[in-house]
C-alpha cells in the first residue's frame, strides 16, 4: 500500500537526520558539527525545543494532499530516539506542548492530535512511530555516565531500579498514545 511516513521534530530546523546526530556511535555518517565539543553540541540540540515553532503547520492540508495522491495510511514520529514528544505527554516536559517550546501557545499545540484527527477523518490507517530508546530520559541515558552508543549507558543488572523506571515511563507513554488519540492501527 501507498502511504505517508513522516519524521518531524525540532531536529528538522537544522536539517539533521532525525536524532542520530546526538549519538556518538553514528558520527561517521551524520555530518555533525565537530568543531564544538559533544557536550556543547548535545546542549544545543536539546535546546532546539526553544525555537521549534511550526506556525505554518496545516494538518488538514497534509491529509488532503495525501488523499489526493491515493495514499492509504499515515505514520507519524510521535517520538524519535532524542525523546522529544510531538504530543502532550504527561511523562516528560521534553515535548511540543512544553512552556519552553514556543509552539505551546498555538491554538492546538498537540501536533499528534491534530495530525491523527485530520487523517482519521479521511479514513486513513493510522500509525504511531514510537522510539523505545529515549536519549533524553535519565533512566535510559543517565547523566551519571557518558553518553555512548544507542543503548542504555549503564548495566541494567547493576541498576535494575533505573531500568524499571524506564520501563514504566515507556509503558505510560504508549498507553497515552493508545488511549488518547483514537484508533491506532500500527505501532512502529
Where do the model's predicted regions map?
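Mature catalytic domains of secreted/periplasmic carbohydrate-active enzymes
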Residues: 1-188
Amino acid at each position: 500500500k501507498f502511504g505517508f511516513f513522516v519524521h518531524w521534530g525540532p531536529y528538522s530546523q537544522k536539517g539533521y537526520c532525525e536524532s542520530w546526530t546526538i549519538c556518538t556511535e553514528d558520527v561517521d555518517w551524520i555530518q555533525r558539527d565537530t568543531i564544538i565539543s559533544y557536550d556543547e553540541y548535545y546542549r544545543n540540540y536539546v535546546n532546539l525545543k526553544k525555537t521549534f515553532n511550526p506556525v505554518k503547520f496545516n494538518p488538514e492540508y497534509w491529509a488532503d494532499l495525501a488523499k489526493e495522491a491515493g495514499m492509504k495510511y499515515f505514520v507519524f514520529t510521535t517520538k524519535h530516539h532524542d525523546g522529544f514528544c510531538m504530543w502532550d505527554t504527561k511523562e516528560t516536559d521534553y515535548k511540543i506542548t512544553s512552556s519552553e517550546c514556543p509552539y505551546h501557545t498555538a491554538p492546538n499545540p498537540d501536533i499528534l492530535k491534530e495530525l491523527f484527527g485530520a487523517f482519521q477523518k479521511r479514513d486513513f490507517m493510522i500509525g504511531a512511530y514510537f522510539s523505545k530508546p529515549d536519549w533524553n530520559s535519565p533512566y535510559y541515558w543517565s547523566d551519571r555516565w557518558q553518553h555512548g552508543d544507542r543503548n542504555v549507558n549503564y548495566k541494567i543488572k547493576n541498576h535494575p531500579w533505573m531500568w524499571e523506571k524506564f520501563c514504566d515511563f515507556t509503558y505510560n507513554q504508549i498507553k497515552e498514545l493508545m488511549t488518547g488519540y483514537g484508533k491506532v492501527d500500527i505501532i512502529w
